[in-house]
A protein has these predicted regions:
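Extracellular beta-strand-rich recognition modules
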Residues: 136, 213-216, 222, 226-238, ...
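Terminal, low-complexity interaction segments
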Residues: 104, 253, 258-323
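Extended, low-complexity, turn-rich repeat/linker tracts enriched in Gly/Pro/Ser/Thr and Asp/Glu
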Residues: 15-18, 208, 222-224, 235-246, ...
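Extracellular carbohydrate-recognition regions
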Residues: 125-177
Length: 323
C-alpha cells in the first residue's frame, strides 16, 4: 500500500484516546488503484497552538523548533507539538535544533502536546544566527595521517594523541595549519609540543605542562545584545587511578586595557567518571567582541606540576532566533 492508493479496508472502527475516528485491528486491505495525493490547503495553527481543538482529522501545518522529540512553537506556548509515527523518509531525526515546518493530519491533544501525523517536513535551518563556528573537521587530513584516536568518545585513556608539531601534511604541520587560520597557541616552559591532535579536536597539556588557545579575530558580532553566547565542548582527562584531572578553565576577553575573565564551571566528577563532552556557555552580555578583541580559552593552573589535561571542540558564537 502506497500513499495515494485507493483501497478497500475491512476492520473494526473505533476511536483513539483523543476521541478521533480511526480504524484499528485491520483484517483485510485491498488496493483498488493507484493515484496521486491531492492534499487540501493546510490550516496554520502555529499562532493558536494552545487553543486549537478539532473533532476531525483536519489538515494542518505548524512551525517551530524541533528538540529531538517535540516541536516548540514559541517560548510562551503551553503546548508543544508531537509528530506521531513519523516515517524515516521525512528525515526528522536529523533536524534537532532546526526550525521546521510540519504539515499533516491533526491527531488530537494529549496534554501537554498537540499531535500531528506528518505528511511533509520542511527544514528552515538552525534555530540560531552563527557569528563564529569552529569544529576542527578540516583537520581530518592530519588526523588520518597520524592515526590519532578519540579519547573522549571511546573513554579510552590509551587512544593515540600526537603533538600538533609532529604531524605533517603537504609540508605543513598541524600546529602551523591551525595558527595560519589566525589562532595562536599559548603554552608554558617554551614547549609547544604539549598541544595534541585527536580525531578532529584538540587536547591540551600533560603532567607539568599547560596550554591554551587564542581565537582568531572575529568580526560581525552585534553589541548590546543580551542573548549572544560563546560556547564550546570540553572534557577533562581521567588518570589511570581513576582521578579526574582538576582542570579550571577560564575565558578571557581583552579589548585594549579592558579585560574580562569568565570562569567555566568545574566538572565536579567523581573518580572513575566516564569521559564525555560538556557544553560550556558564556554570555556576551556587556562584553565587546570585534576584530580587535583577544579571546583566550585556557586553564588557570599554570604554576602547578600536576596533570591538568583537557580536550576542546565545537567553538561557537551564536544568537538564538526568536520565532
Amino acid at each position: 500500500v502506497a500513499v495515494g492508493d485507493k483501497i478497500s479496508l475491512l476492520g473494526t472502527k473505533s476511536s483513539d484516546s483523543q476521541k478521533l475516528a480511526t480504524v484499528i485491528d485491520c483484517d483485510e486491505v485491498t488496493v483498488l488503484s493507484g493515484g496521486a495525493v491531492n492534499y487540501p490547503e493546510p490550516e496554520d495553527i502555529s499562532a493558536k497552538i494552545d487553543d486549537y481543538t478539532s473533532s476531525k482529522r483536519g489538515y494542518v501545518t505548524v512551525k517551530g523548533v524541533f528538540n529531538g522529540s517535540t516541536l516548540t512553537v514559541s517560548e510562551d506556548a503551553k503546548y508543544s507539538v508531537s509528530v506521531v509515527d513519523a516515517p524515516s523518509s521525512l528525515g526528522l531525526s536529523a533536524l534537532t535544533g532546526h526550525i521546521v515546518t510540519v504539515t499533516g493530519y491533526y491527531a488530537g491533544l494529549a496534554e501537554p502536546v498537540q499531535r500531528i501525523m506528518a505528511t511533509d517536513v520542511e527544514d528552515n535551518g538552525l534555530n540560531e544566527i552563527v557569528y563564529f563556528l569552529e569544529n576542527f573537521e578540516w583537520l581530518e587530513p592530519w588526523s588520518v595521517a597520524s592515526g590519532v584516536g578519540q579519547t573522549v568518545e571511546t573513554d579510552n585513556l590509551d587512544a593515540k594523541a600526537t603533538a600538533l608539531t609532529s604531524i605533517t601534511v603537504d609540508g605543513v604541520t598541524a600546529f602551523d595549519a591551525v595558527e595560519k587560520l589566525g589562532y595562536k597557541f599559548i603554552y608554558d616552559k617554551n614547549d609547544n609540543k604539549r598541544i595534541y591532535l585527536q580525531q578532529n579536536y584538540l587536547k591540551f597539556g600533560k603532567t607539568g605542562n599547560h596550554a591554551g588557545i587564542i581565537l582568531p579575530p572575529i568580526d560581525g558580532v552585534p553589541e548590546a545584545k543580551d542573548n549572544v553566547t560563546l560556547s564550546f565542548d570540553w572534557c577533562g582527562m581521567r588518570q589511570g587511578s581513576g582521578k579526574i584531572d582538576p582542570v579550571n578553565l577560564i575565558v578571557i576577553f581583552e579589548n585594549g586595557s579592558d579585560k574580562v575573565q569568565i570562569d567555566i564551571p568545574e566538572l565536579g566528577w567523581e573518580d572513575g567518571h566516564k569521559l564525555e563532552w560538556v557544553r560550556a556557555e558564556v554570555s556576551l552580555k556587556g562584553i565587546t567582541v570585534n576584530k580587535d578583541t583577544k579571546i583566550t580559552i585556557t586553564q588557570t593552573q599554570w604554576e602547578v606540576g600536576t596533570a591538568n589535561r583537557w580536550f576542546l571542540d565545537n567553538i561557537k558564537i551564536s544568537e538564538p532566533i526568536k520565532l
